[in-house]
Swiss-Prot record:
Name by which UniProt lists this protein: Chaperone protein DnaJ
Residue ranges occupied by any J domain in the UniProt entry: 6-71
Family: Belongs to the DnaJ family.
Organism: Caldicellulosiruptor saccharolyticus (strain ATCC 43494 / DSM 8903 / Tp8T 6331)
Residues at which Zn(2+) 2 binds: 176, 179, 202, 205
Subunit (UniProt): Homodimer.
Lineage: Bacteria, Bacillati, Bacillota, Bacillota incertae sedis, Caldicellulosiruptorales
Purpose of the protein: Participates actively in the response to hyperosmotic and heat shock by preventing the aggregation of stress-denatured proteins and by disaggregating proteins, also in an autonomous, DnaK-independent fashion. Unfolded proteins bind initially to DnaJ; upon interaction with the DnaJ-bound protein, DnaK hydrolyzes its bound ATP, resulting in the formation of a stable complex. GrpE releases ADP from DnaK; ATP binding to DnaK triggers the release of the substrate protein, thus completing the reaction cycle.
Length: 387
């Protein structure tokens, strides 16, 4: 039997090529050797068939895996056979035999074989398309109150020109010459258990019985195209960093008529210069003067809802907190909102006028330890420690 060319060599790609690289190589070669571009050229026609056969295997992850492991023998049981035996025999006994792969070999060997003497044509079942995951950054305010966003995504979709068939509109696929249109390859093969007749899915046409010789120019015969779409997303109020929104059916196109995959949007919340979120509560540090802290009074503070006024109690200490109910983050289930926690930071002036210094000295003279509880307790402990 003539030695088949390596599928990677046919498409001119390395063995570690990505699916996108394989698709690009196929489109370029299919255009170059297409029968319409080479009328009457038998060599170009054979080359075009080679290209389609190679792409049929390498574009399918499962077929590609088998090809990488077993080569052409993965799809043609008679490939490399000599006189009904096995190519090369067992020259080294069982020393070189990979028993770890025996399960795969056995599965391939008896694919399509029915122990009662009948066979059935296997077709690839519809499969769900792959899911897509993207990150979406929100401001803190957008995450708290919710919003609507529109994001671009790239995904594989069914070709609108050929309807996913891969055939140029107006053209029809031709009958597969390898299987005669049956979609199956029948062969006799010697095995460890005797001689068997096996029926396998045709690797040239993938079991459909036809070959696309006049591919759709929009998708290059793949039946799918890569497009950018803009998807609208409703962001619920109260969503947190790291949470995921799933849009069903917005992922990659389904395979063999299967449903589309899903789109998963992972939320990232940008840091806010003023507020910090902890669960459903918001925290903010508000600087106040030492006069505000000592005398108390009303001050204006920021919230995500706008400015509001709160009261500072006389004698407020640095780090004291006030909790404002219902000014935090909404609960996703609609059970109200968390709180806004205001932490007071007492700011001491670094520059004072002579008049201010004089007044503070008088204030110090009029002060007693009774007005400074922490200071009084500190010195009481010192005296107790050394008495």
């Amino acid at each position: 039997m003539a030695q088949k060319k390596d599928y990677y060599e046919i498409l001119g790609v390395p063995r570690n090529a990505t699916q996108e690289e394989i698709k690009r190589a196929y489109r370029r070669l299919a255009k170059q050797y297409h029968p319409d571009a080479n009328p009457g050229n038998k060599e170009a026609e054979e080359k075009f068939k080679e290209i389609n056969e190679a792409y049929e295997v390498l574009s399918d992850p499962e077929k590609r895996r088998k090809y990488d492991q077993f080569g052409h023998a993965a799809f043609d049981p008679t490939y490399g056979a000599q006189g009904g035996g096995f190519s090369g025999g067992f020259t080294g006994g069982f020393a070189d035999f990979d028993f770890g792969s025996f399960g795969d070999i056995f599965e391939d060997l008896f694919e399509g074989f029915d122990i009662f003497g009948s066979s059935r044509r296997r077709k690839e079942a519809p499969r769900k398309g792959a899911d897509i995951q993207v990150d979406l950054e929100l401001t803190l305010k957008e995450s708290v109150f919710g919003c609507e966003k529109e994001i671009p995504i790239y995904r594989t979709e069914k070709c609108s020109v050929c309807g996913g068939s891969g055939v140029r509109p107006g053209a029809t696929p031709v009958r597969c010459q390898k299987c005669g249109g049956t979609g199956q390859i029948r062969s006799r093969q010697a095995t460890f258990f005797g001689e068997f007749t096996t029926i396998k899915t045709c690797d040239a046409c993938g079991g459909v019985g036809t070959i696309i010789t006049d591919p759709c120019r929009e998708c290059g015969g793949t039946g799918t195209v890569r497009r950018q779409r803009r998807v609208k997303i409703n962001i619920p109020a109260g969503i947190d960093d790291g949470q995921v929104i799933t849009l069903g059916g917005e992922g990659e196109s389904g395979i063999k008529g299967g449903p589309n995959g899903d789109l998963h949007i992972r939320i990232k919340i940008a840091p806010h210069p003023v507020f910090k979120r902890v669960g459903q509560d918001l925290y903010v540090e508000v600087p106040i003067t030492f006069v505000n802290a000592a005398l108390g009074g009303e001050i204006e503070i920021p919230t995500l809802d706008g400015k509001t006024k709160i009261r500072v109690e006389p004698g407020t200490q640095n780090g004291d907190e006030v909790r404002i109910k219902g000014k935090g983050v909404p609960y996703l289930r609609g059970r109200g909102r968390g709180d806004l926690v205001v932490k007071f930071v007492i700011e001491v002036p670094k520059k004072l006028s002579e008049k201010q210094k004089e007044l503070l000295r008088k204030f110090e003279e009029l002060s007693s330890e009774e007005g400074y509880e922490k200071r009084k307790h500190f010195w009481d402990r010192i005296r107790e420690a050394f008495s």
